[in-house]
Amino acid sequence: MTTTTAGALTALGGQTVSRETINLLHYLQIRFTGAGGVAIDPSTIDGNEIEFRDAAGTLVSLPAPTRVGTTDVFRYGLSADLAAGRYTITILGGSFADVNGIANVTETETFTLVSPTAALTDPVRGQVTYVDEFGTRGYVDITFTPAPGATLNVAEILALRPTFSGGGAESLTITSVTRQGTSNVFRFAF
């Protein structure tokens, strides 16, 4: 059986993707495929063919799509940045057709957006450290983990000058940031 689908979703379907990558693009692209690989009827793509939902199941409003050239790819703009979480795209059955008039079937795909993370490595998170001891040690180590498919922006991390809070830490000033070898651990000296 041959059906009309939105096949390009499977490239993203089930994947974990960098939130920042999607938010830099400010759009999602979907390639619609006709039955047996024939072209779709582009006049049947009007923005009412998909439902896009965030992790809470809330419908995310999308404007009518823009066709990319003369292809079967359509671009759906994003009016706001997407938060980290699992998203669902449902292509509604019967909402578009190929040039032979064969309507599509319902298709649902999901993808997860994640952000890079930073975690205190030394001292270990939750470790009790006295103010005097902390002040004389002169540094903290922080491990940065990029989102899947992304790399760390080392120059940006080296330029960071975070602030500390808590008993006595308010007067600390970061004097240098160094990468520990080729790892994702950075030492913030004060």
Which residues does each predicted region cover?
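Short, surface-exposed alpha-helix to beta-strand junction/turn motifs within ectodomains of secreted
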Residues: L28, V38-P65, G149-S176
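Acidic, Ser/Thr/Gly/Pro-rich low-complexity segments and short DxT(G/T)-type signature motifs
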Residues: M1-H26, L59, D81-G138, T163
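Aromatic sugar-binding surface patches on proteins
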Residues: G69-G77, G181-F190
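Hydrophobic residues positioned within well-ordered beta-strands of beta-sheet architectures
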Residues: L28-I30, N48, F74, I89, ...
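Extracellular ectodomain surface segments
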Residues: R19-V38, P42-T44, V131-A147, N153-E156
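Hydrophobic residues in beta-strands and at strand termini
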Residues: F32-G36, L78, I91, L113, ...
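Extracellular/lumen-exposed scaffold segments
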Residues: G94-D98, E170, G181
